[in-house]
Amino acid sequence: MRVAAGTRHDGRVRLEPVTWEILTEQLAEHVAGQASASGDGSAWRRVAVDGAPPAPTGELAEELAEALRLRGRPVLVVDADGFLRADSLRFEFGKQDPDAYYDLWYDTGALWREVFGPLDRGGDGRVLPDLRAPSVDRPTRSPHVLLPRGGVMVLHGPFLLGHWFPFDLSVHLGLSAKALERQTPVGERWRLPAFARYAEEVAPEEAADVCVRADKPRHPAWNGPPRHGSPPPP
């Protein structure tokens, strides 16, 4: 990850203050401009908004989607929680096992098959927006959604990096360990070791194209907008 000039430093990247509105607009400009720069307006764009549950990943994904629609881009927002595995698989080692939460809860194979596969070269653009409803532990039976060519898929949720998903842009909403603990409900703090492991094994603040620090929700900071022309992840 490149380092941008800024006024805050977290030990890895230098950050500068930004508003959510400016951040969203600059991300939308970048995504919309990727197709123009590549000369392939028919290719789908795939965006990650990665972060722990206390981070506003869903809110940013929806705001980014709206900004892209205003630029004439069809958008499909996908919540990773719609691809949680069945309870029998998630809770095989108990309901509060942080390693199982990290390794087993999210069905990455289904995400490859139902979300990324249809948006690959030669795909038909028919994306399954969700697979299961975790609140009732049943399949959602949602119909496939046709995302027109030139459209953008925005996937949001935790642990999105490190799987070689073919994102054209990855945004990580980071929280310091203290902020993450403070903003996590007491009954969910058993998950904290999973996020410590993610930080250690994947280093999302370095792996992502854009890093946003969201310790103070009203006062985010980031490492600056992505540069046009940078190669997509492998």
Predicted regions, residues:
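Glycine-rich phosphate-binding P-loop
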Residues: 48-66
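Conserved nucleotide-sensing/catalytic segment adjacent to the nucleotide-binding pocket
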Residues: 11-12, 76-137
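NTP-dependent small-molecule kinase module
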Residues: 1-34, 169, 173, 178, ...
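Pre-Walker A (Motif I) flank of P-loop NTPase domains
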Residues: 41-47, 150
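Post-Walker A helix-loop "phosphate-sensing" segment adjacent to the P-loop in P-loop NTPases
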Residues: 66-76
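Hydrophobic/aromatic beta-strand patches that form the interior of the parallel beta-sheet core
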Residues: 47, 76-78, 154, 169-171, ...
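ATP-dependent NMP and nucleoside kinases share a basic, alpha-helical "lid"
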Residues: 137-184
